[in-house]
């Protein structure tokens, strides 16, 4: 019996060591990639006090956090509502890029671990699954460097996704055996979940809406399985709705639409995407035949 237990423990230790080694390897690889790429395109704009995407006159360099807050008010009014991501974007311009390289590599590593957590929760350690997730995290992404390595995009997509998946952990770990928390703890957790939900919904237009849908599906699942729905589950959803509303109601969204010449008719957009889908499907069918 003891020898069997020792064997199980040894296997667990080996698997945990393998997980740590894989995560460390991914961190190191992405750190190298981050170090090979400098700033580009919109990155330079955010080194200065934000007055709009069209620079007029001589731009003034950021001098501190106060300049960032002032710029984000302008950003919300004339560009878009992605304030948390762009606040961090400007904040990291105050440091050497090596700081961003390290933190961004950590976020890439965390993304893989969080996906693994959600996919493998309450199951034995699955090393092949973790390897597949990290491989697909890069190979399955269209232009991965544009989402993970490019300075401006990393804040908007990589970092926000990590935050959302972390927020959703509090729905994933819920089960029927969980004891009802003390009222004082539930109040604190409810407030924290509301705040976390606001920032999860206030990420970007695609992921904010997806997060709201994911939380709703969790609550529906809890109801079907007759699992208790706690107050913090509800306040989390209210937070996501609030954050998503702040994002969508930004005056800058309307300003950007007014400054573009793209078609605004939603039906024409849907028909255009339908035609593209039919074309791609036809090409794939021909290739299969």
Segments (PLM) and residue ranges:
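Hydrophobic core segments of transmembrane alpha-helices in multi-pass, intramembrane catalytic enzymes
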Residues: 104, 108, 156-167, 210-218
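Membrane-interfacial entry segments at the cytosolic side of transmembrane helices
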Residues: 12-15, 182-189, 224-238
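Membrane-interface micro-motifs in multi-pass membrane enzymes
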Residues: 128-175, 204
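Short hydrophobic alpha-helices at membrane interfaces in multi-pass membrane enzymes
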Residues: 173-198
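Structural signal for the C-terminal ends of transmembrane alpha-helices
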Residues: 32-33, 114-122, 140-141, 169-179, ...
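Start-transfer (signal-anchor) and selected internal transmembrane alpha helices
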Residues: 1-29
């Amino acid at each position: 019996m003891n020898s069997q237990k020792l064997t199980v423990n040894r296997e667990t230790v080996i698997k945990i060591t393998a997980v740590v080694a894989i995560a460390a390897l991914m961190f190191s690889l992405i750190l190298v990639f981050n170090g090979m790429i400098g700033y580009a395109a919109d990155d330079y704009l955010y080194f200065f006090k934000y007055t709009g995407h069209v620079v007029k006159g001589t731009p003034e360099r950021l001098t501190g956090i106060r300049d960032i807050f002032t710029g984000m008010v302008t950003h919300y009014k004339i560009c878009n509502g992605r304030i948390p991501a762009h606040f961090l974007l400007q904040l990291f311009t105050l440091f050497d890029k090596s700081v961003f390289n390290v933190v961004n590599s950590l976020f890439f590593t965390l993304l893989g671990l969080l996906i693994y957590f959600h996919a493998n929760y309450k199951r034995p350690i699955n090393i092949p699954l973790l390897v597949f997730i990290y491989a697909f995290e890069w190979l399955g992404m269209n232009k991965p460097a544009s989402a993970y390595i490019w300075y401006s995009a990393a804040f908007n997509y990589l970092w926000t996704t990590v935050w959302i998946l972390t927020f959703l952990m509090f729905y994933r770990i819920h089960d029927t055996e969980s004891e009802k928390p003390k009222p004082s703890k539930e109040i604190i957790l409810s407030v924290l979940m509301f705040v976390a939900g606001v920032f999860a919904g206030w990420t970007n237009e695609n992921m904010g809406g997806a997060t709201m849908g994911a939380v709703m599906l969790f609550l529906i699942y809890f109801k079907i399985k007759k699992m208790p729905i706690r107050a913090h589950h509800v306040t989390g959803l209210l937070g996501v709705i609030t954050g998503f509303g702040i994002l969508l109601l930004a005056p800058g969204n309307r300003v950007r639409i007014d400054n573009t010449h793209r078609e605004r008719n939603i039906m024409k957009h849907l028909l255009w995407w339908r035609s593209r889908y039919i074309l791609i499907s036809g090409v794939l069918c021909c290739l299969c035949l």
